[in-house]
């Protein structure tokens, strides 16, 4: 009887993540209820975020991309802002990997992490979030947490049209009062996050 009770508690306490590419939103769920909803920027066309059922494979607070970043010259000026690691680097220059803080890998090289949200899908396949949301997701998930990615990535014009709509697929009234804290309510529009002080891809 005790084992059954523990199993029920475990199921009820299960944390999961849903990523809606159409709405450009990520949802943190506990017991099937949304406890936190974050705007995102997923993979752009040519680098679309793959849909499917995954699990968190790795967590790393100070992760850097091994494939993407920028190239600077000997004076530190940016030569290529959106560079691949195998691009030619000018003499005296260097390749600087893109920072991906609070990284939660869930599919190959793709994961959720803190990053710049320009207001439309813009990444190389990862799911960017405003930093305060990435921290909350990072602290709530574990290796093995289910991640479901669904929906169709909108074109830029269509997405910007949707951003004026009050419709969201999920009810975003927070079931967990901790996430109703004003610290998780950014002082900017829900679809846009300003660039942080550090450079982001």
Per-segment meaning from a language model:
Residues 1-6:
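Bacterial N-terminal signal peptides
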Residues 8-84, 89-93, 101:
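Cell wall/extracellular polymer interaction/catalysis modules
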Residues 47-51, 70-201:
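Exported/periplasmic cell-wall-interacting domains
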């Amino acid at each position: 009887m005790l084992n059954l009770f523990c199993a029920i508690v475990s199921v009820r306490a299960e944390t999961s993540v849903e990523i809606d590419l159409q709405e450009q939103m990520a949802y943190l769920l506990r017991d099937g209820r949304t406890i936190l909803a974050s705007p995102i920027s997923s993979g752009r066309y040519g680098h679309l975020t793959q849909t499917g059922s995954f699990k968190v494979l790795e967590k790393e607070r100070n992760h850097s991309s091994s494939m993407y970043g920028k190239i600077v010259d000997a004076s530190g000026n940016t030569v290529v802002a959106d560079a691949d690691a195998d691009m030619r680097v000018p003499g005296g220059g260097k390749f600087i990997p893109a920072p991906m803080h609070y990284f939660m890998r869930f599919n190959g090289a793709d994961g959720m992490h803190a990053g710049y949200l320009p207001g439309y899908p813009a990444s190389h396949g990862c799911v960017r979030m405003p930093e305060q949301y990435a921290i909350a997701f990072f602290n709530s998930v574990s290796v093995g947490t289910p991640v479901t990615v669904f929906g169709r990535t909108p074109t830029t014009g269509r997405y910007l049209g949707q951003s004026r709509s009050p419709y969201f697929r999920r009810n975003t009234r927070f079931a967990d009062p901790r996430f109703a804290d004003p610290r998780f309510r950014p002082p900017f529009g829900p679809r846009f996050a300003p660039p942080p002080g550090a450079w982001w891809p």
